[in-house]
Amino acid sequence: MERILKTAFAREAAAGGMVLLKNDNGVLPLAKDAKVALFGRPSYYVFRMGSGSGDMLAQPPRQIYQGLEDAGISVHSALKEHSLKWHTENIGRLDIINRNWFEWTNIMPEIPLDEALVDQAAAESDVAILTIGRCCGEDNDLRLEKGSFYLSDEEEALVKLVNAKFKKTVLLLNVGSMIDLSIFDTYSFDAILYTALAGETSGDAIADLLTGRITPSAKMAATWAKKYEDYPTTKEFGGAITHYSEGIYVGYRYFDTFNVEPRYAFGYGLSYTSFDIAITDIRLDGTVVDVSATVKNTGNYAGREVVQCYLSAPDGKLEKAYQDLVAYIKTDLIAPGESEDVVLSFDLTDHASFLEDNASYILEPGKYIVRVGNSSRNTHVAGAITLAEEVTTVKACTRLAVNMFHREISKKDATPYTYAGEAEEIAAATELALDPADIELTVFAPTETNPPKLLTVADEDKNTTYTLDDVRAGRATVEQVVAQMDSFELASFVNGAIYEGAEKNATVGSMAKKVHGAAGETWSSEKYAIPANACADGPSGIRLSVFGSPVETDTDMAHLMVAFPSGTILANSWDLDAARKLGACVKDDMDILGIEGWLAPGLNIQRNPLNGRNFEYYSEDPLISGRCAAYVTYGVQCDDDGEQTGFYTTIKHLAANNSDCNRGYCDSIISERALREIYLKGFQIAVEEAQPHALMTSYNMINGMYCSTNYDLLTGILRGEWGFDGMVMTDWNCAGAPSLFQYAGNDLVMPGNSKQPILRALETGAIDRASVQKSVCRILELVLKTNFVKK
């Protein structure tokens, strides 16, 4: 695929995920002959991505002023020239700041402006466009201070100045996640576009929306509160011990259940056109619910709508949120006056609640209200499913119970969100009875009863050395190859390969030998004909770079890669086809480079807006997170015919990595119910729908146990319940006892600095040899899915 085609897709996908939050007085789209004045440093030096491993070193991004000028919009020249001159003279280390792990930044100093220049721009322009930007990322959470979560003094002054001087104003939010917007309650702007971090085509995609070449169609995949204190997570974020006291009430589940009015609701987003969603039918087939609707474009622009389906479950033994997202679909482009029929489907058993008392998923008796609309705060009742008795859908094992005092909030005294006519809609709704006999019970046996078996060399094979070529030819099994390996070879294979000379300065990007700038690679062996697998960071493309101080020169190949939109943009698009296409484009870049594994996508829940890596992740909702990850995985691992491509994704970070500062030593205290229904659910969806070939664990602990060495998480749930059949790897330089990695089900220690501890443990018997052999088998099975498939 030619690069121009990938950048064209990146531009389209970026525009599809930018949310129009406000559009008063018909300011947008801009007139074809509009004259605009651009304010804010990101208007001239846009943040295309966040910092850390999620950053990209591709071509310089298209700037906002460039995109507008190429679209035929007149950008005030004197203001532009002043801004570009000052920016160039004061760029300092901004051009390499995200390459040095100790120089992360959230904000760029603003451009000083003479009031006379602003007056001139106001007299000669029709519209003022102000861009507010924020950069955050790995090891770089936002902070509750000015210039981070809050606007800086310079930004506040600029807001007031633009508001006072211009009659028509547009605000662009070039941010990875929510920042405080309370100043705009007083100093109002006519239009607000949440551009997020959109990759290298940022300026062109923004111009496409501002000029109306593309009609906005994105919706919020996370709730934005009016103030930070409105989130239930504000008192428990980023500490050494973090109690997830909100339980299942995350994001809109909290705001709706406790009736806290958000600034921008989950699922909200405006368009230049308008739509009518008419519910036409609801059906029940076994446990599957189908809701049919007709979407009509009632406005004057061609556009796309996102139809969302929510479920309100009855309370019983367990409290339930006011509603949960259970299905969604994005229409095709609908012309004015035209319609499209859609069907939203979901299986009611997928939304059973976890009862910790007996480690079971249950559907409780009562009425399940089905709602359809275009945001969480704009739905109508489509019907109801009734269940006469409690039914257990899954019998599991207690795996991740809290082992200390832990209290969660309750909705007992809360009054939930409602809307005019809701009670009447529920009373008049079509009711469909679910027969308990139609609900199948799934029982998971304890995985502890089936431990790995020690592999030994058969007598007839003692004079034969089997290789991976023999496995490929059908002359041997992977197990026969691994059975031959001595302790050193086993310890080598379960560690990433750090080439000679890099051990003492093993920075990200310096450890791979196969592809310079890659994040790491697996061990290779001529003896067993086993090639190395190289992996590179994501999730917005392939990042090839070396972190350090001083910053090293980029590799030539790094700039050939496309910087695609961030995970948040992809989620805001609610477009699964775009997710699949993004995966296919990334796969093409992997092929160019010789990279087999992509360390992406990331699908941790956006629990709190301060998390620096929110831009990498998809949503506060596990359904959106899981489905986005699944479709990206489809695009990477499968071609259009469903055949394996020889490339793979590594979904990450399992699990509850919801703060990036102090991430290696924090303990997330979470009820097993909240874990299973919120923080693990997206991973479960991605695994069950797409079977990614690899998965990465997170740095943090859950309930006192590091995720990287947690048997219950990696073997009991991931493999025992979800059926994951791929390889698990650690994050780079994680904590956790080396003797526990493979026993827990963590196969590959990255970047590879635990070889000696594991070798000693093998030789002393402190580690189960059969578990290490099993991990090597999984690694070789991954190699068979990649290198040999490509050949």
Positions of the model-derived regions?
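Glycoside hydrolase catalytic-domain context in secreted enzymes
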Residues: 1-354, 360-372, 376-378, 398-791
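Short beta-strand elements
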Residues: 378-395
